[in-house]
From Swiss-Prot:
Membrane topology according to the record: Peripheral membrane protein
Species in which this protein is naturally found: Streptococcus pneumoniae serotype 19F (strain G54)
Keywords on record: ATP synthesis, ATP-binding, Cell membrane, CF(1), Hydrogen ion transport, Ion transport, Membrane, Nucleotide-binding, Translocase, Transport
One Gene Ontology term, aspect cellular component: plasma membrane
Residues bound to ATP: G155, G156, A157, G158, V159, G160, K161, T162
Reactions accelerated catalytically: ATP + H2O + 4 H(+)(in) = ADP + phosphate + 5 H(+)(out)
Name listed for the protein in its UniProt record: ATP synthase subunit beta
EC code(s) of this entry: 7.1.2.2
Any GO molecular function: ATP hydrolysis activity
Matches recorded under CDD domains: ATP-synt_F1_beta_C, ATP-synt_F1_beta_N, F1-ATPase_beta_CD
Job description of the protein: Produces ATP from ADP in the presence of a proton gradient across the membrane. The catalytic sites are hosted primarily by the beta subunits.
Domain of life: Bacteria
């Protein structure tokens, strides 16, 4: 183990000088320094640059308060390594793989893997385009997720991103026995805390590993925490052969942390002040999220769009990697339609006849056409009323409203708030239900019977209760 001494500390950046004859640490190696406090607190630094003459520049993963020039720094000889395997389920970690819940810490001999790895090679990748059934009608019908694909989840505050994420974790765990890894990147600590307790109450936590790099942490930790979560997910994929769900909230904050680190390292900023290495950093993360012949990692990434500008380099760079987009819309929340997924703005590469089948594709296309036409007619209805529409248009509007309500459903994880049991609807049931609505089979049933239900059988049962 070679050792050096701290030469200077500039916020989260620490320069370390290694004496002549000492082996210089490699880029991305973890260095360790112990503070002079009572607990001898360990601070981990990651090597970012070699400046020459035995000097390396590092980024701290924790606060550098208390570090002084001349302190001894040890090279661990390897990158940051985090615990992996079944023991991580139900636990909460930070970027270094240390547990931050109140339960017993991991033992020193627990299996660990480095957070820096190469993406799978071409011959390791799986070429099949298989749909990941979520049991959520609006997603499965109109913007299906691919196994091993990447989904962008766009939405403002209070439109149901967290509930949708929890429902996806619940459904994958219940129906597929799948594992989920939740990674909070630059999360508000309060939100992360709420999510942890909600997941504990709903029982989903047993199939989930959680990793947090909160908003108050140094940029190095926020930048690397996504890799920590991904490393845990990769182990389940490659060693256990599992289909894993990886949630990253928020991918924009990963970019933001990278921008801060880049400025601290003295790199010249690029467009809009972002780091010149933006596309490379995003690519290194995204290319590791994929399906191999052993298993898959499907990622659902919340993406904040600064000032609603989709041409901003941060969301624009993320877009290039996405297979599906799920857009949450505030207008649907106001109508009481949950999940508030916008059926016209959401899209998926998987919605193609060769992947989902001819019938599914045709039904989805017709649902979109009917909703689009209803959208166009809304101005006429608002100004002149329904009476000005032709009989054909009146029928279309009635069916569109039934479709809009049928796209909603009660979530299992929200049962404690709504008092209504949640539902999981297989894709075949979803397609059949919408096909029958489009064919006019249920034109005689009241609109309210379609709201917040699962399959079409639930609609019929609800209508009977209402006296129809």
């Amino acid at each position: 183990m070679s050792s050096g001494k701290i030469a200077q500390v500039i916020g989260p950046v620490v320069d370390v000088l290694f004496a002549a004859g000492e082996k210089l640490p490699e880029i991305n190696n973890a260095l360790v320094v112990y503070k002079n406090d009572e607990r001898k607190t360990k601070i981990v630094l990651e090597v970012a640059l070699e400046l020459g003459d035995g000097m390396v520049r590092t980024i701290a993963m924790e606060s550098t308060d208390g570090l002084t020039r001349g302190m001894e720094v040890l090279d661990t000889g390897r990158p940051i390594s985090v615990p992996v395997g079944k023991e991580t389920l139900g636990r909460v970690f930070n970027v270094l793989g240390d547990t931050i819940d109140l339960e017993a810490p991991f033992t020193e001999d627990a299996e660990r893997q480095p957070i820096h790895k190469k993406a799978p090679t071409f011959d390791e990748l799986s070429t099949s385009s298989e749909i990941l059934e979520t049991g959520i009608k609006v997603i499965d019908l109109l913007a299906p997720y691919l196994k091993g694909g990447k989904v962008g989840l766009f939405g403002g505050a209070g439109v149901g991103k967290t509930v949708l994420i929890q429902e996806l974790i619940h459904n994958i765990a219940q129906e597929h026995g799948g594992i989920s890894v939740f990674t909070g990147v630059g999360e508000r600590t309060r939100e992360g805390n709420d999510l942890y307790w909600e997941m504990k109450e709903s029982g989903v936590i047993e199939k989930t590993a959680m990793v947090f790099g909160q908003m108050n942490e140094p940029p190095g930790a926020r930048m690397r925490v996504a890799l920590t979560g991904l490393t845990i997910a990769e182990y389940f994929r490659d060693v256990e052969g599992q289909d894993v769900l990886l949630f990253i909230d928020n991918i924009f904050r990963f970019t933001q942390a990278g921008s801060e680190v880049s400025a601290l390292l003295g790199r010249m900023p690029s467009a809009v002040g972002y780091q010149p290495t933006l596309a490379t950093e995003m690519g290194q993360l995204q290319e590791r999220i994929t399906s191999t012949k052993k298993g898959s990692v499907t990622s659902i990434q919340a993406i904040y769009v600064p000032a609603d500008d989709y041409t901003d380099p941060a969301p624009a760079t993320a877009f290039a990697h996405l297979d599906s987009t799920t857009n949450l819309e505030r207008k649907l929340v106001q109508l009481g339609i949950y999940p508030a997924v916008d059926p016209l703005a959401s899209s998926s590469r998987a919605l193609a006849p060769e992947i989902v089948g001819e019938e599914h594709y045709a039904v989805a296309a017709e649902v979109k056409r009917v909703l689009q036409r209803y959208h166009e007619l809304q101005d006429i209805i608002a100004i002149l009323g329904m009476d000005e529409l032709s009989d054909e248009e009146k029928t279309l509007v009635a069916r569109a409203r039934r479709i809009q309500f049928f796209l909603s459903q009660n979530x299992n994880v929200a049962e404690q708030f709504t008092g209504q049991p949640g539902s999981y609807v297989p894709v075949a049931e979803t397609v059949r239900g919408f096909k029958e609505i489009l064919d006019g089979k249920y034109d005689h049933l009241p609109e309210d019977a379609f709201r917040g239900v699962g399959s079409i059988e639930d609609v019929i049962a609800k209508a009977e209760k209402m006296g129809f």
